[in-house]
Amino acid sequence: DIMSSVKPLLSMMIGKNVELSVSCRDTPITILADGGLLEQVLVNLASNARDAMPEGGLLSIYGDVVEMTDEFTHSHGTAHAGRYALITVADRGHGMDEATRTRIFEPFFTTKEVGRGTGLGLAMVYGIIKQHNGFLDVTSKPGEGTTFRIYLPLAGPSLVPFPEETPEATASPAWQ
């Protein structure tokens, strides 16, 4: 379980001023992914969250499964409707204005002072998620914090619609 295995590293990395809450649905969520790369995504997002909360705060990471409609995937420029793993990373930091939010995935774009960041962390996050056929949704308001929602396609039978319920075929949850 990626989220459980990375929790000790994140706790150590974010320090004592930031409270970390990591949770996931009780049923395992299966995706086809490079675990090391997804851990890097979580480390980069946690690092940015820590920096956005210099006086401390709460960093929440939650895993779930969602059904994406054609309308949603079309409006977000993604390829397919269907069932996705959703990893939500939310902080209560200083947040971003719209002008900043629209540029955060550009390589070398940073709001950090010289010597504190390269501007590559979120560009890498974006690239890793795209490499896994996923997509990101970011919401942020100055003074209220930032939420990253990472959508990754589920593995196995969940990639196709559930069959019609008949005596011969019954749908089973993707996480079993």
Annotate each PLM feature:
Residues D1-Q176:
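Core catalytic ATP-binding domain of two-component histidine kinases
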